[in-house]
Amino acid sequence: MLENIRIVLIETSHSGNIGSAARAMKTMGLTQLCLVSPKSVDEQSYALSAGAENIVKNARVVDSFDEAVDDCSLVIGTSARLRHLQNTLIEPRECAEKVVAYKGKIAIVFGRERIGLTNEELLKCHYHLNIPANPDYSSLNLAMAVQLVSYELRMAFLVQNNKKNSLSLIEKNYPTTDQLAYFFDYTERIYQSLGFIQNQGVMRKLKRLYYRAKLEKNELNILNGMLSAVEKRIDLTKEDN
């Protein structure tokens, strides 16, 4: 899912910001970087990427905003809290939730260091992402903004994955109470015949062990099959004697 997210940097003037943004992306599992008319991509870009050189190296470099987002069906642009954008303003957490729920390609666009995105560029965005920083000092540099948004994207991605894992647990086929009771009775009977269980304390511990294991039905069938094989061996031994 994260591979569908493209971070777009518009006309970045400080080459080091490109490297720092790439580092911020990689720490959160993002890999798709697009640069629109950067002033330069140089040694400082690579030096400040600090292990994310591959993201800088593989960054797509284009000439315009339109070219950067041409194959994306959801475009989110960073913006100050402007009155005429109130209906489309979202904060990083809401942005991340929308992004991870989306099926197509997504571009998250960060504007120029000094002036951000132009009004024309903002009009081409479906949503406008505003970071609710301290109003008395709201100055975030480009890489900081990328790090913050990338973090929220990763957290939303992990939450979504946890939900999927929870659903997969629910969908697993677990034995009924009656089936477990049959298994426990069968286990106790076989183990008693082997002389393994001398008192109920051992059986209680075995039950706790099996409950902790959260046996699925097919796993219980395997254990019942093992008990059946042991029972047949016991019967054969009795016949031989």
UniProtKB/Swiss-Prot annotation:
Protein family (similarity comment): Belongs to the class IV-like SAM-binding methyltransferase superfamily. RNA methyltransferase TrmH family.
Does the keyword field hold Methyltransferase? Answer: yes
CDD domains the UniProt entry points to: SpoU-like_TrmJ (cd18093)
* GO CC terms in record: cytosol
**Could you tell me which Gene3D superfamilies the record lists for this protein?**
1.10.8.590, 3.40.1280.10
Query: Which N-terminal stretch is annotated as signal sequence?
Result: none
Q: What is the lineage of its organism?
A: Bacteria, Pseudomonadati, Pseudomonadota, Gammaproteobacteria, Pasteurellales
The protein's GO terms of the molecular function aspect are: RNA binding; RNA methyltransferase activity
**Which NCBIfam families did the record assign?**
PRK15114.1, rRNA_methyl_1
Q: What is this protein called?
A: Uncharacterized tRNA/rRNA methyltransferase HI_0380
GO biological process terms held by the UniProt record: tRNA nucleoside ribose methylation
Q: Which UniProt keywords apply?
A: Methyltransferase, S-adenosyl-L-methionine, Transferase
Q: What is its EC number?
A: 2.1.1.-
- Species of origin: Haemophilus influenzae (strain ATCC 51907 / DSM 11121 / KW20 / Rd)
Query: A Pfam family in this protein?
Result: SpoU_methylase
Tagged with keyword Methyltransferase: yes
* Lineage top rank: taxon: Bacteria
Quote the record's binding site residues for S-adenosyl-L-methionine: 78-80, 111, 131, 138-140
